[in-house]
Amino acid sequence: MTHTNGFDALHAHAQRLRGAAIPALLAAEPQRPTQYARQVGPLYFNFARQKYDRAALDALFAIARERDLAGAFQRLFRGEQVNVTEQRAALHTALRGDLTDAPVASDAYATAAEVRQRVGALIQQLEGTDVTDIVSVGIGGSDLGPRLVADALRAPSGARFRVHFVSNVDGAAMQRTLATLDPARTAGILISKTFGTQETLLNGSILHAWLGGSERLYAVSANPERAAKAFDIAPGRVLPMWDWVGGRYSLWSAVGFPIALAIGFERFEQLLDGAAQFDAHVLNTPLEENVAVLHGLTAVWNRNLLGSATHAVMTYDQRLALLPAYLQQLVMESLGKRVKLDGAAVDSDTVAVWWGGAGTDVQHSFFQALHQGTSVVPADFIGTVHNDDPYAENHVALMANVLAQTEALANGQDSSDPHRSYPGGRPSTVILLDALTPQALGALISMYEHSVYVQSVMWGINAFDQFGVELGKQLASQLLPALKGEAADVADPVTRELLAKLRG
């Protein structure tokens, strides 16, 4: 990005604004609270407390145009091979809508719709049985997205199915889950793109044995034959996914089977509709008014121009407590790259470390560092305007904390006692959902997906591969025989010492 024509001008704006006080920016642009706000369907965004001004934003958008960001979105939605290292499209948007006239994307949408009908039919079959509990086994993109949505949108009581998620290869996770369930009233879903994932195969074997066979086992995989063979699952209970959808973008596909069981099929479709509506905003809105573009460019500004190494996400709605973990994978697996599309080294830092938690709990853990630490951490604060629980006073208190914390981080407070002085200057974006509905959550997740793509285009990297996860898995596979007491050639001296300790 530093080699773009407009970078020097952008850098000059950063030098000018790095030490600027956020109240001074607001005073210089009196209309800033509304001019830097956007409403897209059920989502409201306010960027007024970010440390840029109109001139800096114009320079950012100039580089976005130089990077052909609008064309990059067209290529994404039309099903061109934007995943160049694996020579694949990235058609997660086609799982939820048909927004272009491109045959590849339209065919993908039709295929996904057919599979979704199969999901609905399987749910109807399960509703006619005595099954009350579902154990969903997957990891990474096969777990984090479904787990987030099911937890966020499940009814407080009265759901037809209780869905339990197991991901970790640690047997304690499966043991604790199964200890509360009756195998005669439980079904299992095994989700793995390749059906070669160690965690899913090991946990799937435990579940298969506990259930007493495969009669109530289902699978979702891009390798359906392997899935059916591994656990003797009838082909009619194996749902496909495709290599043109990455795992972390796959909750909209049959990977969402446990979501539909947890919240109901109709509400699952509403989730997809919400995402598709936000997709339409991204595809059809000029860059300057495009919220996903502004969110992504803000992340680039904070990372590359202001030097922020981390980014925090705080969800002021307990039902969204799993969102930071989901975003960690979406953002860091997509953008944790050190080479560009052509294999050359990047010319600027890429992804920040994303982390966070649920408010107000986090105010009593890491907010001390946000307010008075030496690192400036940009943040997203996410809340809901309306809440449907019966405790209205609690919701008022929750939203008061959103307003108070963002103001305190931005403005700070002087004190004659340096220990009680708040420097301020901490930027944040506030995102408010009208209410936590399936449509709103779908739109929110879509926004973050597209923000990630914006950043990848600006940095010239591939957001859709993840080769960095492979080496550790390969080494773990090679070390398994040694841990079982078999002879193995282990070259690394530290690993040899640790093996000796583990083997006693």
Swiss-Prot record:
One of its GO terms (cellular component) is cytosol. The active site is at 333 (proton donor), 364, 473. PROSITE patterns: P_GLUCOSE_ISOMERASE_1 (PS00765), P_GLUCOSE_ISOMERASE_2 (PS00174), P_GLUCOSE_ISOMERASE_3 (PS51463). It holds the Pfam family PGI. Keywords: Cytoplasm, Gluconeogenesis, Glycolysis, Isomerase. CDD domains: SIS_PGI_1, SIS_PGI_2. The keyword Isomerase applies. Its EC number is 5.3.1.9. GO terms for biological process: gluconeogenesis; glucose 6-phosphate metabolic process; glycolytic process. It is found in: Cytoplasm. GO terms for molecular function: carbohydrate derivative binding; glucose-6-phosphate isomerase activity; monosaccharide binding. Pathway: Carbohydrate biosynthesis; gluconeogenesis; Carbohydrate degradation; glycolysis; D-glyceraldehyde 3-phosphate and glycerone phosphate from D-glucose: step 2/4. Its main location: cytoplasm. Belongs to the GPI family. HAMAP family: G6P_isomerase. This is Glucose-6-phosphate isomerase. The gene is pgi.
